[in-house]
Amino acid sequence: PTAAKNAIVIGCDIRPSSESLKKATIEGILDAGTDVIDLGMTGTEEVYFATSHYEAMGGIEVTASHNPINYNGLKLVREQSKPISADTGLADIQKIAEQGEFITPAQRGEYELRDDKTAYVDHLLGYIDPTALKPLKVVVNPGNGSAGPTLDLITERLQAANAPIEFIKLNYEPDGSF
């Protein structure tokens, strides 16, 4: 991977408000002089992977997780996908925000779209040997969330490797109207 030491990776779920919240967050990060790698529509686990994979200084998933549709927020991780908490930087961020003393950067950050899930799928499939699998029927239900496209890539790769798995797909198309 291309190292991105001065970058934040960001992705978002399928909620109707996620894309606009992600765009606003990206603009703020760029204005602060930090580069952004936009992963597109992702699950939180993809942001965690990309933060480490691209050697970014942090990651953000725009999501409200299991909360109702009218909620939204930001899940933050530090470098190497380490959790961020009051003890590990969140209190510092709060203090800076409350004081309003922001640094003016020498230049605006740079934006890059990297919505290719290949490295993530390679990582996941690196844990198994498709040829060693026994015949299996698997029902996969991503609940119309952001995992559907990633699961499509996984099933395609396993089928191309002649893995003896039959996939039954339910609720596969991303749909933010839950």
Cite the ranges covered by each PLM segment:
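An N-terminal, well-structured beta->alpha segment
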Residues: 1-27, 31-32, 110-137
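Gly/Ser/Thr-enriched, mixed-charge loops and adjacent short helices
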Residues: 72-178
